[in-house]
Amino acid sequence: MYLNIPTEIWLCILKMDIDSTINLLFTNKYFFDLFEFAKHNFNVLHEVIKRGYVHILKYVDELENLGPLVFIETMNVHDKLKLACNHDQLPIVKYLVETNSNIETINDDVIITASFYGRTNIVEYFIKKDIDNKTIFEALKNACDNGHLETMILLINNGVDIKAKDNFIIKQAISKGHLNIVKYLVENGATIDIEDDTYIINSAQKGYYKMVEYLVYRGADYRTVDDLPIRCALMGGHLDVVKYLQSLGADIEADNESTIDYVFKHGPNESKEYLERYFYWNSLING
């Protein structure tokens, strides 16, 4: 019945939204020839992998073994695995690993990709395949960079040293503002060099209010370098940080008003408005 429908009708059908088109074309193997008309709208293999259609991927592989498929753009196994990691498709990952004999050569890169996206179940699958410590540490860095605590805990529980490379991981977590990760790392033995004022300066500059608060609690000098943390926060428009540090005694005029001048000339509007109110109330109080 379907084969008797004129091509013009099929072309109209294929102009539906992409989800409807894909769901239609994947319902019957006889529809595969129609991908020739739809291939400019989407990548067939991409959609198969993104949606976790293992049975269709198997069928495509069977067809490819018989000869090249002109209606499907080719992808190497490495790219297929990375795409599956991106979309958290563990069944696709397992199928690709089980059907490719040379998969060991790319396991390392794939676990790093899975960690980047926080795909904990995929990371766990690859850890069981004897991944070396250097790769696991790189995976930990990727998970930390993107705030994936659950993935980090899995990697740490599998032997990665959280204090390696001079406590690099906790430094990275602070620089990204991931307070939950910082607290977890501290609770599990990582240390913060609280004498290093770059932590509180950078956190204030980026507007990480909770991180600034935590670093102060841990003993960081919030008045370091002529009150640079509060001045950085002011220049960045992070008024919650400014107000917090002011409540502790920090001074936005500590550098002889050069920061004030900069903000009025180049700073964000909210900081300018804050300074106007600040000086207005100061004039009332001080006469």
UniProtKB/Swiss-Prot annotation:
InterPro entries: Ankyrin_rpt, Ankyrin_rpt-contain_sf. ANK repeats lie at residues 40-71, 76-105, 107-134, 135-164, 165-194, 196-224, 225-254. Keywords: ANK repeat, Repeat. This is Putative ankyrin repeat protein R791. It comes from Acanthamoeba polyphaga mimivirus (APMV).
